[in-house]
């Protein structure tokens, strides 16, 4: 469905696994990912997980690099806090295993289609979409005052980054209603 960010020239990519079965929790906690090109890997904090093969030649993930600076070179450390997010990472992993590649594709396709449909409907109503490329989140340029008041009355939670923008994010639980 999507190409690797490296094909677009990205040197560093970050993202969240909250979508993979982790309930919303006021912005966290949830596991995330951080990836970079090989030439930058020694400049990033924390640990690097690499792909390898297990004893049966199946693809497997393993800790490929852990900077020891936080233990032995504290004055030059790029990180000194390691939060255990293992449970959340396992939950996200199990969500992926449960749904499988086809299931994940279907979920992501459904979410993206909802975003496209909403964008078309909002365009018909005269609203201007700011972000030309989107997957699940629309940025609408408008005066937010009246819309915010109506949304709060109906207990709809939008994100308002400024007085003229509404961000609407959709997920697998979003409906046409």
Regions found by a protein language model. Give the residues of each.
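Noncatalytic alpha-helical scaffolds and linker/capping helices
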Residues: 150-154, 159-177
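Conserved PLP-enzyme active-site core in the AAT-like
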Residues: 1-60, 122, 126, 135
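General beta-strand structural signal in soluble alpha/beta enzymes
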Residues: 13-16, 129-131, 158-161, 168
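Structural motif of enzymes handling amino- and sulfur-group chemistry
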Residues: 57-127
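Short beta-alpha connecting loops at secondary-structure transitions
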Residues: 14-22, 46-51, 71-79, 99-106, ...
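Conserved active-site and cofactor/substrate-binding residues in soluble primary-metabolism enzymes
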Residues: 8, 27, 39, 43, ...
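Conserved PLP-binding catalytic core of the aspartate aminotransferase-like
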Residues: 125-152, 170-173
